[in-house]
Each structure stands twice: as structure tokens, then as C-alpha cells.
């Protein structure tokens, strides 16, 4: 069991919650009266603190030598000195994880931060919202949670290396590494993606109004899905000219998707939401009801899979969102209780920290020696295996021209200045598949399935994101795999999970966002929600799959046992809804907030000089507002001197701030406000992230690598820096089947004659 001391309020509470979900013993370090969040945000505190204990700083100092990890979110705050003392007391064998909003180097290293400003700094805001409105923050402090998630991953990576190192996690880099197409579109095409409201710019999906609600859906992303959509329209007599030959071209469909949307709207508007959801799924289309938080508690799939947890709060028992993944041998406490302040005292004879015999000298990555079989495609799964590869694992990606990864071949995802039929030049594929090897194996053949099974026997971990049941039909299910390697770990990450009434339902990221409550809560107050259209839900699922694999490896190190981790992307998204489920359980009506915040004002995104330039500004306290008002020359108004007054008159206040920012460059606004201790940051887009952001440049975030087919281009780097096992972006993404002969020779001992026979039989295609 990993023992963690958690201190500070920047993203550490989120990281601590994720580690609690994987069986860690987490103790919050706080003053006698408790951390401020207990008083200012008791529901949010309960959500993040359940399952943890609490200790005074002096007791924590005595506990430190027995702890494995110091989880430090004090960056620039009043407890920073205490955190440093804890790290010193823990000694050289512990892992000190430092969460830094903008990294620990460069001009922004000491800047003030909130979730809003870090989301702006990392490029998240630029991708969300309607094109004629300001960039929009998603619900649930997603930038903070991404930093916490990367800290949790880095914690298990460092622990696997035997502890004894310092880790720095950049919140900005955590966001910048999670943008799907946000920056790589600029890197590979020179274009900057625009905000497209509720419509994904690469996949033809959007939101539709039904007779009684909203639903996410569209044309689908494959020929099969297009045929199913067309058949649906034909069955309803509203197909128009969609049977014409030109509509068979997927690029044409993407360009003219609004025509199809208009025809679909004719069906959707007359039907009830849930009827549409289930009929679309019956046609194997990734349509999804837009659910509100209060509906989630009765969600048949989440209930059947036991997702929700009971939490004992100071006000009594409550139902909350569960954890993103369940790993055997790494379970959270059976009783999730919100701790009383400083209840943890030092045992009379505290057990010393176990010294990990696997501790190693400095090396490239903590996962060197671990081999992963990658049976994933598109984004969520490849992101998981990319994370493992970045930290040194040998990742073998099985591909086939008979089931091509759409991000290699689809024009919508290709992102390249070159021939869009070339599978080796796709910027999308090449970004999330670096550091991997590629072998082409046709799993539609018995010989191909046998080869995959033989490869799995040489692997520690298998990661797959097929729909439920597909792996079993390929004769590669967990029960079959563990017969060839008893201690193998299989991480499945289907949309809905392998059990439950929706196990066979198909999903895209927008469907997961809709079903998890994200979509309903991301928008402007009083308006139809916009949702999160880019693949953030996919990337969060990928992070959690990597985290689950690391936890399962730690269990295997301890017990010798492998296991099957049955993840659900619906659950990973719902786990990131923040405290909304807990609030709904308490009877609160949870609504979209837009860019506003219940405990800060101003808290928004304001226009700046130049077309499409914006700055995020937040005042956390009355003192910060006073400094903002002085710098901006805002007129004195007694209503604005308190948070209550500012919230009651927020629109007028925002108008005054916008009048000041509109004539000034975003960089200048951010610099003068940060010089006065007020959180602010320009809203970065793909171009400004890559070309102009000094904090990411100081982090050395974008890494150039030469690709034999695509040339030299930048890759998104690592959000975490580890002193002893840093991980790296080492090799470009493989060409299709680049390592086939090498792997068949080195792992399976097949000679050239045997390989030639397999090729002749279509097995290696």
C-alpha cells in the first residue's frame, strides 16, 4: 500500500482522490481549523477528501519517514515551507510530487493560478464554446483534474522505479497534452482550429433537440455507420438525395454534414430522447442521451456496474461519483468517510517505509523491461499506450489494412500537408503513437489470431478498446490470454464496460460526454448547453487506463497475480464530473455556470486587442479584486467591494473589465495583472501554444523528431518531469507494419521462409 501525505490545494486533492481509488492511504496535512475548502466549499471538499485521513503539520512531520509520497500542491502558497519540511523529513527514499500550474521554469513559474487560467494557458478554452461567444470553461475543474491525474500517474511511475526522486507536474502541460487536434492541426497543416459550438470539426456529430430533451449523434465515422444512418433516414422517408453516389465519399459528407444534420433533425424533433438513444444504439450508432446530474443516480448502466459510492459527510450519508477504474488488490477503503480536521495522530511505533528492492539508478524510463501489446485504435486506447511507452515500456501495436485505424487513413483525421492516402504521414496518428512498434497482423484469419496469442505470451500487459465481446470473439479474451501467460494483465476500456445492460452500446467521446453529465453542464446559464466537442473524454479514459495498468503491475509485483481490469469510458468521464453528483444527491439543482464561479468574481474570459484574442481573469479574494480594480482603473462602486456584491452585479462588472481589456493585447493584460498577484493568462490556441508561449518553451514541451515518411515535426511532450526516470519522446510513430519482420524474428523465432508463407496467405496485412 502506498502511503501519501497530501498538502496544498492546487490539484493535489484531485490526485489524492484518484490514489485513494487505487488503495493508497492518503493523509491531508492541514492546520487545526482545517483547510479553507472545508468552510468555503464543503461539498467539493467532501468529494475530494472522502477516504482520506487528516493530520496536523507537526504530526505529519513525524509520519513523513513512514510515507512513500509527498503530494505537494502548495505552489507559492502559505504551506510551501511545510511541504518542503515534509519532503526533507521523508528522506531520499520518498517521492516528492510537486504540482506547478505553469511549470517550474520560465517567466510564468511564479504566477497565480486558478482552473480557469490554467485551462486558458493550456489551450482548452480555445476549443470549447460557440464561435460568436467567448471561449468556454467546461464544468468540473477539468484543468485541475488533468494536473491531478498526471500527478497520480507520475506517482505510480516513480514508485515503480523504487521511489527516491522529485517529480514536477505542469498543469499547463497537462492540458496542452490533452487537446486531441488542438495544437497538432497547426503543427501539421498550419491551420488553427476554430470553436465549432456543439459540432466536432473532424467527426460529423452534433447535438439535436428532441421532443423532450437533447441527444448527441450524427453521421458516424465509418462506412458501416453511414449506411446505418442512411437506412434510418430511408425507413423514416426523409433520406432526400443521400443515396446519390457523391454521399459515399466521407470527405464530402464531412463538408456537407449540415445537410444531413437538417434531415436528421426532422426525425429527432418528433421523438423522445430516450427512444432515440436506444433506437440509434440498436442500429449500432453512437447516439447518446444528454443526461443531467440528477439523472445519473438512476442510470441503469452505472447502477448495474456499482459505480456510485456512499460517502459519510459531516451532514450525514450521501451518494457520490465513484472512481474511474477498479483494480483487484488495489481497492479504496470499504468506508469512505470525510475526515475530521487533524484526526490522525502518530502511532506509538509507526511502521517504517518499506524499501523497494527494485530501486534503480537513473534510467530513461521506469517501465523499461515492461512489454505491452496494443490492441487499440483512434484516440483513447492509443493515448493509454503512449503514456506507458513514454515512460519506457516497449509497446507493440497490432495493426491491419483489413481493420485500419481511421486516424491513419481517414481524410478527416489525417492532418497532413501530404497525400491523404498515405497511412504513414497522418499527424493525428503520429502524435499519439510515438515510441511504439507496429506489426501488421490480420486478426480475421486464424493464423493471425494465433500470432497475436503468441505475441501476448511475451507481454506483461494487453490494452484493448474494442467493443465488449469482440476480444472473446477473436479468441483473445482474458481467459484465453492467461492460459498462455498466467500473470498477464489485460486492461479493457470499452465505452460502457463489459457488463451491464448497455455493454453492447457503441460510443464516441461526445456520446460519453453526453451520458456522463458533462454536456448538460458545459454551457452558458439559461441557454442550451454546448458540451465538450473535442476528445477530452477519450484522453481522460486513456490516462486512467495507463494508471490502472500501473496499479495492476504494482499488485502483480506484490502478489504475482495478473488480472483483467474492466474499465468503462462512461465511468471515467462520470468520475471527472467533480462534485456535481454529490450536490445533486443533496438536493441541489446543478446548472451550467459558463465561465463564472460561485466563489470568485470576476471569473471570466474577456476580449482583447485583435481578432479572436482573449484573456482569462479571476479574482479569488476581495484583496485581489481591489488590485485588479486599481490596475484597470475601474470606477469605485461599493457593491463590488465584497464577493456577495460582485456576484449580485456581475454583468455590470464584466462590462467594465471588458471595456479595459478590449484595447489592450492579451499578453500585456496578463502580465500587468500577474505582476499585481491577480490570476490571468491569455487564451492560447494551437498557434500561440506552439509559437509564443514562454512557459511551454521553458518546459521544452514540444519535441521535434524526424519521421522517415512525414519529415521532422513537433510532438506534444510529457506533462511530468521525474529526476531519476524522466521518460521521453524518443522515436517517431512507426510506419504501418514497420517492425513486423523484427518482432516475428526476435519474439516468435520465425524465419524468413515462415514469414513469407504468412504473407502469401494474407496473414501479415
Where is each model-derived feature located?
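N-terminal helix-loop segment corresponding to the beta1-alpha1 unit
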Residues: 1-161, 274, 311, 344-561, ...
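Terminal low-complexity tails and localization/encapsulation signals of metabolic enzymes
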Residues: 1-3, 194, 209, 292-374, ...
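Extended, hydrophobic interaction surfaces within ordered domains
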Residues: 20, 139-140, 147-161, 168-169, ...
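Short, well-structured beta-strand/strand-turn elements
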Residues: 25-26, 281-295, 395-398, 674-689, ...
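Conserved Rossmann-fold dehydrogenase catalytic segment
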Residues: 133-142, 163-175, 194-200, 245-248, ...
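A short glycine-threonine-serine/GTX helix/turn-capping micro-motif
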Residues: 135-146, 199, 203-205, 214-217, ...
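Substrate-binding/catalytic subdomain of NAD(P)-dependent oxidoreductase enzymes
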Residues: 158-196, 276, 292-293, 552-594
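Aromatic-enriched alpha-helical interface/lid elements that frame and gate functional surfaces
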Residues: 204-283, 287, 602-676, 680
Amino acid at each position: 500500500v502506498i502511503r501519501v501525505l497530501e498538502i496544498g490545494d492546487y490539484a493535489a486533492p484531485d490526485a489524492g482522490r484518484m490514489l485513494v481509488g487505487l488503495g493508497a492511504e492518503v493523509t491531508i496535512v492541514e492546520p487545526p481549523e482545517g483547510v479553507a475548502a472545508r468552510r468555503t466549499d464543503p461539498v467539493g471538499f467532501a468529494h475530494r477528501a472522502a477516504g482520506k485521513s487528516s493530520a496536523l503539520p507537526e504530526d505529519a512531520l513525524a509520519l513523513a519517514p513512514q510515507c512513500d509520497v509527498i503530494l505537494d500542491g502548495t505552489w507559492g502558497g502559505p504551506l510551501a515551507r511545510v511541504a518542503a519540511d515534509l519532503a526533507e523529513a521523508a528522506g531520499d527514499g520518498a517521492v516528492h510530487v510537486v504540482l506547478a500550474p505553469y511549470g517550474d521554469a520560465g517567466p510564468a513559474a511564479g504566477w497565480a493560478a486558478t482552473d480557469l487560467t490554467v485551462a486558458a494557458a493550456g489551450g482548452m478554452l480555445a476549443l470549447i464554446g460557440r464561435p460568436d461567444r467567448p471561449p468556454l470553461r467546461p464544468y468540473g475543474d477539468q484543468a485541475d483534474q488533468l494536473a491531478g491525474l498526471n500527478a497520480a500517474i507520475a506517482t505510480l511511475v516513480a514508485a515503480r522505479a523504487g521511489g527516491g526522486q522529485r517529480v514536477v507536474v505542469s498543469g499547463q502541460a497537462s492540458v496542452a497534452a490533452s487537446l486531441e487536434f488542438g495544437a497538432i492541426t497547426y503543427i501539421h497543416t498550419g491551420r488553427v482550429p476554430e470553436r465549432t459550438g456543439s459540432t466536432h470539426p473532424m467527426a460529423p456529430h452534433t447535438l439535436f433537440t428532441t421532443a423532450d430533451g437533447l441527444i448527441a449523434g450524427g453521421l458516424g465515422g465509418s462506412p458501416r455507420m453511414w449506411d446505418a444512418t442512411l437506412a434510418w433516414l430511408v425507413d423514416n422517408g426523409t433520406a432526400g438525395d443521400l443515396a446519390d453516389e457523391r454521399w459515399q465519399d466521407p470527405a464530402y459528407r464531412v463538408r456537407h454534414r449540415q445537410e444531413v444534420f437538417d434531415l436528421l433533425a426532422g426525425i429527432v424533433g418528433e421523438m423522445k430522447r430516450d427512444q432515440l438513444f436506444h433506437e440509434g444504439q440498436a442500429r449500432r450508432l453512437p447516439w447518446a442521451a444528454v443526461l443531467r446530474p440528477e439523472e445519473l443516480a438512476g442510470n441503469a448502466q452505472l447502477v448495474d456496474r456499482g459505480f456510485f459510492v456512499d460517502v459519510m459527510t459531516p451532514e450525514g450519508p450521501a451518494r457520490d461519483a465513484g472512481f474511474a477504474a477498479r483494480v483487484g488488490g488495489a481497492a479504496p477503503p470499504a468506508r469512505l468517510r470525510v475526515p475530521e480536521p487533524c484526526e490522525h495522530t502518530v502511532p506509538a511505533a509507526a511502521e517504517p517505509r518499506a524499501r523497494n528492492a527494485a530501486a534503480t539508478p537513473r534510467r530513461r524510463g521506469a517501465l523499461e523491461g515492461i512489454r505491452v501489446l496494443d490492441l487499440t485504435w483512434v484516440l483513447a486506447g492509443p493515448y493509454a499506450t503512449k503514456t506507458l511507452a513514454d515512460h519506457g515500456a516497449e509497446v507493440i501495436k497490432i495493426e491491419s489494412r483489413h481493420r485500419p485505424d481511421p486516424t491513419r487513413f481517414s481524410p478527416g483525421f489525417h492532418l497532413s500537408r501530404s497525400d491523404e492516402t498515405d497511412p504513414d504521414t497522418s499527424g493525428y496518428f503520429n502524435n499519439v503513437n510515438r515510441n511504439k512498434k507496429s506489426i501488421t497482423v490480420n486478426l480475421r484469419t486464424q493464423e493471425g489470431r494465433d500470432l497475436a496469442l503468441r505475441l501476448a505470451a511475451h507481454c506483461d500487459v494487453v490494452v484493448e478498446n474494442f467493443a465488449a465481446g469482440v476480444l472473446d470473439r477473436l479468441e483473445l479474451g482474458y481467459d484465453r490470454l492467461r492460459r498462455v501467460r498466467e500473470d498477464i494483465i489485460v486492461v479493457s476500456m470499452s465505452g460502457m464496460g463489459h457488463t451491464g445492460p448497455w455493454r453492447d452500446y457503441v460510443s464516441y467521446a461526445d456520446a460519453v460526454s453526453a451520458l456522463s453529465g458533462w454536456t448538460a453542464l458545459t454551457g452558458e446559464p439559461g441557454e442550451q448547453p454546448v458540451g465538450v466537442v473535442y476528445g477530452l473524454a477519450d484522453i481522460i479514459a486513456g490516462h486512467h487506463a495507463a494508471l490502472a495498468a500501473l496499479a495492476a503491475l504494482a499488485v502483480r509485483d506484490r502478489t504475482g497475480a495478473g488480472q483483467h481490469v474492466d474499465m468503462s469510458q462512461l465511468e471515467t468521464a462520470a468520475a471527472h464530473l467533480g462534485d456535481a453528483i454529490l450536490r445533486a444527491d443533496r438536493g441541489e439543482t446543478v446548472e451550467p455556470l459558463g465561465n463564472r464561479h460561485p466563489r470568485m468574481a470576476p471569473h471570466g474570459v474577456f476580449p482583447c486587442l485583435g481578432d479572436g484574442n482573449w484573456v482569462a481573469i479571476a479574482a479569488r479574494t476581495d484583496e485581489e479584486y481591489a488590485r485588479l480594480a486599481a490596475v484597470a482603473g475601474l470606477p469605485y462602486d461599493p457593491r463590488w467591494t465584497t464577493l456577495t456584491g460582485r456576484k449580485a452585479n456581475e454583468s455590470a462588472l464584466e462590462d467594465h473589465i471588458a471595456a479595459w481589456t478590449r484595447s489592450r493585447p492579451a499578453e500585456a493584460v496578463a502580465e500587468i495583472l500577474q505582476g499585481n498577484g491577480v490570476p490571468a493568462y491569455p487564451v492560447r490556441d494551437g498557434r500561440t501554444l506552439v509559437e509564443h508561449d514562454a512557459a511551454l518553451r521553458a518546459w521544452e514541451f514540444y519535441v521535434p523528431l524526424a519521421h522517415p515518411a512525414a519529415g521532422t515535426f513537433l510532438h506534444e511532450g510529457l506533462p511530468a518531469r521525474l529526476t531519476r526516470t524522466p521518460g521521453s519522446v524518443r522515436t517517431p510513430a512507426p510506419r504501418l507494419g514497420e517492425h513486423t519482420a523484427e518482432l516475428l524474428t526476435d519474439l516468435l523465432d520465425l524465419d524468413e521462409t515462415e514469414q513469407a508463407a504468412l504473407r502469401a496467405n494474407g496473414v501479415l496485412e
